[in-house]
Each structure stands twice: as structure tokens, then as C-alpha cells.
UniProtKB/Swiss-Prot annotation:
InterPro entries: 6-blade_b-propeller_TolB-like (IPR011042), AB_hydrolase_fold (IPR029058), Peptidase_S9_cat (IPR001375). Its EC number is 3.4.14.-. GO terms for cellular component: extracellular region. The lineage of its organism: Eukaryota, Fungi, Dikarya, Ascomycota, Pezizomycotina. It comes from the Eukaryota. Its main location: secreted. Belongs to the peptidase S9C family. It is an enzyme of class 3 (hydrolase). One of its GO terms (molecular function) is aminopeptidase activity. This is Probable dipeptidyl-peptidase 5. The keyword ATP-binding does not apply. The gene is dpp5. Keywords: Aminopeptidase, Glycoprotein, Hydrolase, Protease, Secreted, Serine protease, Signal. It is found in: Secreted.
Amino acid sequence: MAALRWLSAVVAVSTTVLAITPEQMLSAPRRGEAIPNPSGNVALFSASQYSFDTKEKSSSWNLLNLKTGDITLLTDDANVSEIVWLGGDDTSLLYINGTNAEIPGGVELWVSSVKDFSKGYKAASLGASFSGLKAVRTRSGDIKFAVNAQSYANGTAYNEELATKYASTARIYDSIYVRHWDTYLTTTFNAVFAGTLKKGKHQYASAGPLKNLVAPVKNAESPYPPFGDSTDYDVSPDGKWVAFKSKAPDVPRANYTTAYIYLAPHDGSSTATPINGPDSPGTPEGVQGDANYPVFSPDSRHLAYFQMAHKSYESDRRVLYVYTLGSKTTTPAVAGDWNRSPDSAKWLDNKHLILGSEDHARVRLFGPVPIDADDDFKPQNFTDGGAVSSYHVLPDKTVLVTGTAIWTSWNVYTASPKKGVIKTIASANKIDPGLAGLGPEDISEFYYDGNWTKIQSWIIYPENFDSSKKYPLFFYIHGGPQSATPDSWSTRWNAKVFADQGYVVVAPNPTGSTGFGQELTDAIANNWGGAPYEDLVKAWEYVDKNLPYVDTENGVAAGASYGGFMINWIQGSDLGRKFKALVCHDGTFVADAKISTEELWFIEHDFNGTFWGARDNYRRWDPSAPERILQFSTPQLVIHSDQDYRLPVAEGLAMFNVLQERGVPSRFLNFPDENHWVLKQENSLVWHQQMLGWLNRYSGIEEANPDAVSLDDTIIPVVNYNP
């Protein structure tokens, strides 16, 4: 019953402010989105929790009363992987059972009820590991659903347990990608499958085999890896259509971001066709970039989606388009000049949408946005701080929001365009003992003059912060580079965990950051070590001059991905001498090694050309330049994992080699089973012990605070053959 431990915390929680440790954060419950029932009085959500004592993870599905905030357990059966409301009433459910009694490697669809979940029944047997369940109940009472799985070219779903095993482990490629994110490509690919559950007198039953809607389109794939999920496709409310996103199959996938939104009959009676392809009548002129998030209107007459204009720039501005099914005219942009890049949408009604977008280091909701809004229409925000992760429109047209913030891992509330935030229903810092005492007072922000414009930065305070005292600086640099440090919870780079070691964390959003207008985002192109570095220098100078409670003499700095590149760049720069220690996680080091990445469009955009045609651009910001290496002197921890194919592990090894040969105190931390991110809890705990232990040793935190994380907390032996 470990999964239920946190449920009792709903009743009462200590008001004592506690420092949050890495172990507390990693073992705290991780909750999913709150999904409301048709009446909007109860919501479903998933939860999982890892125990460092038992080394096991428990999972559950729960019900949240949207009026009282009370939480009750629905099921703690680990085989229940996904649940959706069946529709037609407020209690019926459809879920995926992650096992199959008849087919090894398959799953099952079950129908049940919140009244007595254990008395459900099997409605369909599926012959592979399907996931991403979406379902609508049609007027006939039948259920039209879509799921996704790996597929063979012939349309058959791939089942790993039943697949042919070759005697050789060889891989052979005639095209790129060879590998992507953390996976070597094979001849199988992701595909969306459609199916029907027929309504019988007493039960639903499968109407026949699933239809593969993607395989008939050569080289199409949906959801698109590595981050594609069920938001890459949608089922129309009338059950007649499925829309899905795929990278454009007619251009080299490693060189272009171009994507199409395809429309297919749910019954698979004809091949899917793109609504925004090069030969589609509705395609807007000059719009050739990534497209995503297709979502049908309630009346099934319109399909909203986002698309970028640039065909090889993954961080171009997204623009909302609304396609009318059956239309042969150009699909109009909606609020086309809005200087934000929305990435989610929900229909408020048949004529208006709610949009989610990054905005000034938050993720906020905007609307209502009319589908016929002119280019100069400016959507209005109606949520506050934090980061919205999902949302659903309720019957009364209020919006049920699930989000996070730097101070809470789960925050459920209602909001509306007219009233703004209405009511907080549940928040992790009020439920979980390990997060007790965290609140919005733990953070603040400031703006300062950067290299060429105003730059925003977060401040995160430690437990029992006292402005009359001094705390070492923890300077955090985000990755991307076209990304941001938002007001959101993270289990990888949790600023509050860092602060509670005894630091004041400062996290700037320099040139290249998203959510502050496209000009700031675009300005990092061919400028990696230029304006962003100067922005960071000026952030440090601002802190040194204006925040008397920050001890910059004993400050430390850390960054990941592009932030890791910047740590390596700082190591060879004057700013590097301002820090007692540095941590580089998965950062680039050798300029010429960038060609070993997988998404070539990224480097070719950010360095204004190909590796052979613009080599000087690649080398302009080279942390491994000899004159920079000669400046290396600040102790540095290098972290790099074997399954990182975005920035291969050789980059971390190269940096560590140079640091060691230069006699700079240094350590290399490697995980053979992690990618660009460290996700497994046991590995993440070691990551925190080593990262914080390294910084604490050189900042003085370890000596001043006996409870601080230490390098010695890790039981993994250190390999050291130095004479």
C-alpha cells in the first residue's frame, strides 16, 4: 500500500518549513493531468511514487472532487496504464490493461466504472503494446478510438516479444538519421491505429481489427519521436476522422523540420492526405516548418493546428491555423502577428479557442481567441504564475488547469477568460509532507540590462531565508539554447532543491530564451558565445552589486546541454574565475564535433550553414580553442551519458581529458543507461549527490552545513589510478 501513503496527507500537513532534499524530491508523488468527467464535477489523475527503501515504484489512478478537493483511490493496479472517460454518463471508463492473457506483448481494452472499478470487463484484445488512447462516443453509442504503436511497413503492429530475432547485431543504413535522441532507427516506426467498440445490449465489444492510418503514407510516422505523444493526433467528436502529424516524408528528415497534418477517415477507407502539404490547396504561401497539435472543434467542422514558417528552424514562431474540413481555399492564420509561440489549444466552443504559450518565463493560458481573428489580434492571458501543463474546458466554460511551479509539483485550479484564476482545488505543497512549507514566497525575479536588451532572471531562496545573511551564489544556465528557465517544477534541475542546500539560486533567461518575443529567441543564431555570454556576465554583475545577501566570492555555476556548452565557454573566459566550481552536464566542447549530432537542421540553422560551407561559424564559439584551454583553472565536474546521441559522450570525455591534463581538479560522471537526461530515480539520486556534493565542497557549504549533500554520500566506488 505504499502508493497510498500520501493520500492521508490530504487531511493535514505540518506547517513546519522543511528543506527539500534530493531524496525527498525524487521520492515525492508524481501526478498527471486532472481529466474531468463530462459533468465537470470529478477528475481522474494518475500518480506514481518511487521508494528508495524498497527500490520499487508504485502507481495508482485517483479521483479528485473538483468541488471539495478530496482525493480518493480508484485503483492501484499497476497494469492499468491509461484511462479515459467513456462518455454518455459521468462514471463509465475505458482503459488500457498493460497485459494480455492471450498474446504475449499485447494489451487489452477494458470498460469499467468509477462506482466499482474492479468489476470491469474486457472489450478488446490488442496484439501489440498500444498506448496513447483517445476515444469518442458517437451518436450511435459506439466508441471510436485511436491508439499508437510501432509498425512494420506493411501496416502490421510490431510486437517486440513476437518479433524475429537476428543472429547478428549489425545495423546497416543508407540514410540519416542513423540514431535519434537515444535510439538507433530500425525499419519499424510509430503509427496511429483506429478501432471501434460496438455497443451491445449490455457490453461493448471489438468491431474488428485496427486500421493503420499511417503506414499507407510512405515514410510517414506519427507520433513523431522522440517527444511525440497522443497530442500528435486527434479523433473528431463525430468519430468520422482522425488527424495526425508526421514529419514531411518527401524531404530528408535530418535536414528539415517540415511537418504535415494529415486527415484520414477513421475507418481507413482511404489514404490519409495532408491539409498543409506542398500540393494541398489550403497551404499558406511560404509556410514550410514544423506543424503540430491538431485538434478538432466540438462540431467536427474545423481542425486547429500550429505551424512554423521556416523549414529548418525548430524554434521558429508557431502560428495558429484553423482548417475547415472539405475547404479548398487557403487556410487562414489566426492572430498571425502575435509575438508568442503557442504550443497547445483547446476549443472553448465551435468559434473560439484557448491557447497555451510560454510568456515571460511562465506557461500561461490565453483566450478566448476567435477563429476568424485578424493578424493584429492580441490574445489575453487569464492565468498567473507557474507553468500550465494541461487544461480542459468544463461545461460551464471555465477551464480546469493542471500545472506546476518552482514551489509545487502539482497544482490544480480553475480559471476563465472573464474571471482569471478562480479557485485552487489541490496543490502538492499542501498535500505532500515532503513539500510542506514551499510556496510562492520562495521565488522572485528581476530584470536587468543585458547585452542589447532587458533580460529576466529568477531568484530562488533557501529554507528560512534571512536577507541579513549571506548565501553562496548558485548560477544556473538553461539549455536549448532556444528554451527558458520557467516557473515550473523539475525532477532534473530543481532550483528549490539546489537552494535548500544553502544557496541563493540565480537563473537568468539570456539571449536565445523563449517566451519573451521571437527577436530574443532568434538573436542567438551564430551568436552562441556572444550576446548570451555577455547577458550572463551582466547578470553576475547585477547580483554582485545589488543583492547584498548573495555571496559571489564563493559562488558556483552549473548548466546542461547549451548550458553545458556555456559552462565550458565560461571555463575559458574571465567569468570562469568568478566561480569556485563548475558543473557541465552534456555540453559541447569541440566545435568540429557538432557534426556528430543527429538533427542536422539545428546546427545548420544556428551556425548559418553547413559544416563544410560555414566552418568558421562553427569554430567562432569553440570552447576547445587552445587560447581558451590555457585559461582553464576552475574545478569542474563533467557529466555525460552513453545514450546521449544529441551530444555524444565523446564531448564530455574530451573536456575531462583536457581538464585532467591541465591539472584542473575535475571528475567525470557517466551513466551507461541514460540519455541527454538522467531519468531513473537511483541514477538521479547519484547525479544529485555528485553534482551538489561537488559544488558544496568548493563553495564552503559542505563545511558550514553538516546536513548538506556530500560527494561521500554516493556508495558507487570512484575509479582513480592517478599516481
